[in-house]
């Protein structure tokens, strides 16, 4: 008998032992309902497709608190605002850790980051650094000129297309906007002038990095699964992508450490962290390292370059499909701001009402991250009367909550008016609308992301009228989704801009 076959038999024996042990323990608990399980793989076969849609279909059968068995990993899926509040508020501290996956461990530099690191002293120190130094209101305001300048450049490029009456690939244009803002404020790199990164290579790197995190890995679900990851090539693919990411981040750091480098009047995120690392005390407190810096800029890169662009694209898709809403929001924007503006600033955002409802409705119907990153219970808790054992993974399906007919009338309809006279907001305090999460794990870059979405969409609506290319109608607009963690529109939206005179 070959060594490999012996290994597989031992692995099978181990899995059977784990399954029977878990069954014995779980028989004494009131666990959430869920679909029937197959031997060994559990419920993995139910996730054949986009996970948020697969889980939406299962929610309709098994309810808002549902348990799946993914290999040997128990996962509880939350699909109601009441259950989400219990997880993210009532039991926030008890379940604010993160499960370990091979991809998250690798891309976060062994959890030297904020997004994927498990809860503990090091994570708390990094989170405090982010809130006070990197994403404070003062820092947010200091980067306002970057957001406004990049939007000015977008308007200029769209105006050139308007003169030719040529269609614009909005997906591409909005990625350039979002990535350019992130590169300037985080890395100090002007995407239009950088010597070592350009728009296409950044888009490719971001896409590959996101997909590898969501790709199936045996080691995430089975003991000894790393052997099969090596055989299937998953480990090799992950290491290759990480090498490219690490190479990019090393170039960013090397550029910042060049002797005689001119530091901008407003230091970027990397400048701030390098300065903190150089000035930190030598006592026993938390020490910031180069890997921490790379872990944090990895978070910013992966979470920042695509989410805002995805949200603006979904908003424009729904507006072009709903001419009534498009006219209403453009009438408000142009009436409030006046007819003769040649530039939009972030101060203009405070004057708009219906426009803000359009943003809310986009977040409800098309959250960029429809599944919040999974949490891990650090103690046994109860959710909606069900027992959730320690070490259980917990995932909130924001997509399902946004389509709950008990919360939203005609939930599939794009109708911003549903938020008139509603106090529901998207900053983590209302559990009906959670595009940025809530609690201790809420997205630390939320304010920056909201500003990028609002200012980008406002420029598109104020300066341009929009139409479909000749021969196409609203019925031709494809709403099919694609993605891994960030879910965007599969087929790009091509529109013809007409600059308002």
From Swiss-Prot:
GO molecular function: heme binding; iron ion binding; monooxygenase activity; oxidoreductase activity, acting on paired donors, with incorporation or reduction of molecular oxygen
Keywords recorded for this protein, A-Z: Heme, Iron, Membrane, Metal-binding, Monooxygenase, Oxidoreductase, Transmembrane, Transmembrane helix
Membrane topology (UniProt): Single-pass membrane protein
Cofactor(s) needed: heme
Record EC number: 1.14.-.-
GO CC field: cytosol; membrane
Transmembrane segments annotated in the record for this chain: 1-21
Chief location: membrane
Cystine crosslinks: none
Positions contributing to heme binding: 443
Signal peptide span: none
Alphabetical list of PANTHER family matching this protein: CYTOCHROME P450 71A9-LIKE ISOFORM X1, CYTOCHROME P450 FAMILY 71 PROTEIN
Name of this protein: Cytochrome P450 71B23
């Amino acid at each position: 008998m070959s060594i490999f076959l012996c290994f597989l038999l031992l692995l099978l024996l181990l899995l059977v032992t784990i399954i029977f042990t878990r069954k014995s323990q779980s028989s004494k608990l009131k666990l959430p309902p869920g679909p029937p399980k197959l031997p060994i793989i559990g419920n993995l076969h139910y996730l054949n497709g986009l996970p948020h849609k697969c889980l939406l279909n299962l929610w309709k059968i098994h309810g808002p608190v549902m348990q799946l068995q993914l290999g040997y990993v128990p996962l509880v899926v939350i699909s109601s605002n009441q259950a989400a509040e219990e997880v993210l508020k009532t039991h926030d501290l008890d379940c604010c850790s993160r499960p370990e996956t091979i991809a998250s461990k690798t891309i976060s530099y062994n959890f030297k980051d904020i997004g994927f690191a498990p809860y503990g002293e090091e994570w708390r120190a990094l989170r405090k650094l982010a809130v006070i130094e990197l994403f404070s209101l003062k820092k947010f305001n200091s980067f306002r000129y970057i957001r406004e300048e990049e939007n000015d450049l977008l308007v200029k490029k769209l105006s050139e297309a308007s003169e030719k009456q040529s269609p614009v690939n909005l997906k591409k244009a909005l990625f350039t906007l979002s990535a350019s803002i992130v590169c300037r404020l985080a890395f100090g790199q002007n995407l239009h002038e950088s010597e070592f990164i350009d728009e296409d290579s950044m888009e490719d790197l971001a896409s590959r990095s996101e997909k590898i995190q969501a790709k199936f890995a045996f080691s995430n679900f089975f003991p000894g699964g790393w052997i099969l990851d090596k055989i299937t090539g998953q480990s090799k693919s992950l290491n290759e992508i990480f090498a490219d990411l690490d190479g990019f981040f090393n170039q960013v750091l090397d550029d910042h450490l060049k002797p005689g480098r001119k530091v901008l009047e407003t230091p970027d995120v990397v400048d701030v962290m390098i300065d903190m690392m150089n000035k930190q005390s030598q006592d026993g407190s938390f020490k910031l390292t180069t890997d921490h810096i790379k872990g944090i800029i990895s978070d910013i890169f992966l979470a920042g370059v695509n989410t805002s662009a995805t949200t603006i694209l979904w908003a424009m898709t729904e507006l072009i499909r709903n001419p009534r809403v498009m006219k209403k929001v453009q009438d408000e924007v142009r009436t409030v701001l006046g007819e003769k503006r040649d530039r939009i600033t972030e101060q203009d955002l405070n004057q708009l009402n219906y426009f803000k409802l359009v943003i809310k409705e986009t977040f409800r119907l098309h959250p960029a991250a429809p599944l919040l990153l999974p949490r891990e219970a650090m103690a046994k808790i109860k959710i909606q009367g069900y027992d959730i054992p320690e070490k259980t993974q917990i995932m909130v399906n924001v997509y399902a909550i946004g389509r709950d007919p008990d919360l939203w009338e005609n939930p599939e309809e794009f109708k911003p008016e549903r938020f008139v006279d509603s106090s529901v907001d998207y900053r983590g305090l209302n559990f009906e609308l959670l595009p940025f999460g809530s609690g201790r794990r809420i997205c630390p870059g939320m304010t920056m992301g909201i500003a990028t979405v609002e200012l980008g969409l406002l420029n598109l609506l104020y300066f341009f009228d929009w139409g479909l290319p000749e021969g196409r109608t609203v019925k031709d607009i494809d709403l099919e989704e694609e993605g891994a963690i960030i879910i965007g529109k599969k087929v790009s939206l091509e529109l013809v801009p007409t600059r308002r005179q």
